[in-house]
UniProtKB/Swiss-Prot annotation:
A monovalent cation. Ammonium or potassium. This is Type III pantothenate kinase. Pathway: Cofactor biosynthesis; coenzyme A biosynthesis; CoA from (R)-pantothenate: step 1/5. Keywords: ATP-binding, Coenzyme A biosynthesis, Cytoplasm, Kinase, Metal-binding, Nucleotide-binding, Potassium, Transferase. Homodimer. It comes from Mycolicibacterium paratuberculosis (strain ATCC BAA-968 / K-10) (Mycobacterium paratuberculosis). The gene is coaX.
Amino acid sequence: MLLAIDVRNTHTVVGLISGSKEHAKVVQQWRIRTESEITADELALTIDGLIGDDSERLTGAAALSTVPSVLHEVRLMLDQYWPSVPHVLIEPGVRTGIPLLVDNPKEVGADRIVNCLAAFHRFQSPAIVIDFGSSICVDVVSAKGEFLGGAIAPGLQVSSDAAAARSAALRRVELARPRSVIGKNTVECMQAGAVFGFAGLVDGLVGRIREDVPGFGGDDVAIVATGHTAPLLLPELDTVSHYDQHLTLHGLRLVFERNRDAQRGRLKTAR
C-alpha cells in the first residue's frame, strides 16, 4: 500500500494506493486543510487517524508540497513515524522521468510536474493538463513526454474571495452554478462571473495553446482536467476531454515506482 501526500497552499490530499503499475488503484482519499505551521507530530497524528490499520500495511510513501515548510515536516514525519517505509519526496534532484524544457526547472511546482507525468503516462500523447486548485495551472507536455511550460491564473475561490475582500458591497459567496449567466442578485452575479468567466478563461487558454504551439492542433492531444473545483466547471468547458480526480496521486505513484526500480527496490528510509 502506497501512502501519497499532496500538499497544496490551501488543502492537502492524502491517498492510499493499492497495487502498482497498470494494476494500481486509489482505494481511499481524504482532503484536509493545509496548515503552514503544522508540525511533524501533528501531521502524523492526522494521517494515522485517517489511514487507521492500513498504517501497518504501508510499503512506500510519496509526497509533494507547494508549501516548503510543510515539506520539511512531512520528511520528519516519515522519518520518525514510519522509519522502515521507503519514501520519495518530489524536490530538485529526484528522478521524475519528465524533462523540464523551461528557463529554470527548479521553479516548476512539483504538482505541475507529476500531473504532466501522469497524463503522458496514461494517454501516451501530447497533453494539456488543467489543475483547478487555489491557482489554475494549464500545463503542456509534448509527444515525447517533455514539460514545455504553461500558464497560471488565480483560482475560482481565490478570485471570488479577493473581490469580496476589496469591495464593501460584495461578500464571500458559495461557488456554485447560478441559474443563468445573467445574475438576478449579487450572489448570482458573482457566481456567474466565477463559473462562466473562468470556463471562458480556460477554454481560451487551451484554444490559444492549440493554435500557437506546434503539434497541438490535432485530435491526438489529450486535454485533461483535475483538481477539487474541476467538477464545477466541467459542464461549462468546451475543450476538456478527460477528467481524472486522482491524477496527482498517480503521478506521485509513478515517481515512487521510477525511483524504487532505479535503486532495485532500495529507497530512502530513516537512518
